[in-house]
């Protein structure tokens, strides 16, 4: 069984996340892809929308998408979200699965700061997501820690010019987010009043800066 893991703050989840997940599911020939919202990311700033709101939005975003499941493992565990702990929990559920961990290219430089990164990378195949216009073929060598390196697959996904930061800013400024998020997510944001008073300059939380 080929199982993918796609984690992040998803604050909020948007169409780009949805397209990337679908591209990964197809291109990597995954049997299943887990979307894993973080409870609290160690490498992110303090301001983050509450976990129950983000989980509800992620479920709305991916509802009905075949092959994709929202897994609340990190939110249910609480505290700081260390990916190595999440992977171990997933392995206990699917001991025979081949695990593929999806991360954004912008996250690669943070790998040396991830908690117990060597053990993490021994349990998964790392897949680096890129939105380059021209797909890069072949493996990518990443300096994971000190002088060591890991070989990762590079997956070129559809280019989507949007970010969670931009969406939060648009909501705060009273502008439309139609086309940025699925309708169900837009409805949730409107009904709960999320992001209307979100602080300016908040760090982008959209893609997998884990630890």
Swiss-Prot record:
<keyword id="KW-0547">Nucleotide-binding</keyword>
<keyword id="KW-0548">Nucleotidyltransferase</keyword>
<dbReference type="InterPro" id="IPR004821">
    <property type="entry name" value="Cyt_trans-like"/>
</dbReference>
<dbReference type="GO" id="GO:0005524">
    <property type="term" value="F:ATP binding"/>
</dbReference>
<dbReference type="Pfam" id="PF01467">
    <property type="entry name" value="CTP_transf_like"/>
</dbReference>
<protein>
    <recommendedName>
        <fullName>Probable nicotinate-nucleotide adenylyltransferase</fullName>
        <ecNumber>2.7.7.18</ecNumber>
    </recommendedName>
</protein>
<keyword id="KW-0520">NAD</keyword>
<keyword id="KW-0067">ATP-binding</keyword>
<keyword id="KW-0662">Pyridine nucleotide biosynthesis</keyword>
<keyword id="KW-0808">Transferase</keyword>
<comment type="similarity">
    <text>Belongs to the NadD family.</text>
</comment>
<comment type="function">
    <text>Catalyzes the reversible adenylation of nicotinate mononucleotide (NaMN) to nicotinic acid adenine dinucleotide (NaAD).</text>
</comment>
<dbReference type="GO" id="GO:0009435">
    <property type="term" value="P:NAD biosynthetic process"/>
</dbReference>
<dbReference type="GO" id="GO:0004515">
    <property type="term" value="F:nicotinate-nucleotide adenylyltransferase activity"/>
</dbReference>
<dbReference type="InterPro" id="IPR014729">
    <property type="entry name" value="Rossmann-like_a/b/a_fold"/>
</dbReference>
<dbReference type="InterPro" id="IPR005248">
    <property type="entry name" value="NadD/NMNAT"/>
</dbReference>
<comment type="pathway">
    <text>Cofactor biosynthesis; NAD(+) biosynthesis; deamido-NAD(+) from nicotinate D-ribonucleotide: step 1/1.</text>
</comment>
């Amino acid at each position: 069984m080929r199982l993918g893991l796609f984690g992040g703050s998803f604050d909020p989840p948007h169409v780009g996340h949805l397209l990337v997940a679908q591209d990964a599911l197809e291109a990597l020939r995954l049997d299943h892809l887990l979307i894993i919202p973080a409870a609290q990311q160690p490498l992110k700033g303090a301001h983050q929308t509450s976990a129950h709101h983000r989980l509800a939005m992620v479920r709305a975003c991916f509802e009905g998408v075949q092959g994709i499941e929202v897994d609340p493992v990190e939110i249910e565990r609480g505290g700081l979200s260390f990916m190595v702990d999440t992977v171990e929990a997933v392995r206990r559920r699917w001991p025979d699965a081949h695990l593929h961990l999806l991360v954004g290219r912008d996250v690669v430089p943070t790998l040396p700061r991830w908690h117990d990164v060597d053990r993490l990378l021994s349990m998964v195949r790392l897949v680096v997501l890129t939105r380059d216009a021209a797909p890069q073929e072949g493996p990518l060598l990443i300096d994971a820690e000190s002088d060591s390196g890991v070989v990762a697959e590079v997956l070129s996904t559809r280019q989507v010019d949007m970010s969670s930061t931009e969406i939060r800013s648009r909501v705060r400024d009273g502008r439309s987010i139609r086309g940025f998020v699925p309708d169900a997510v837009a409805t949730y944001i409107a009904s709960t009043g999320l992001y209307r008073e979100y602080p300016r300059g908040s760090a982008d939380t959209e893609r997998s800066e884990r630890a």
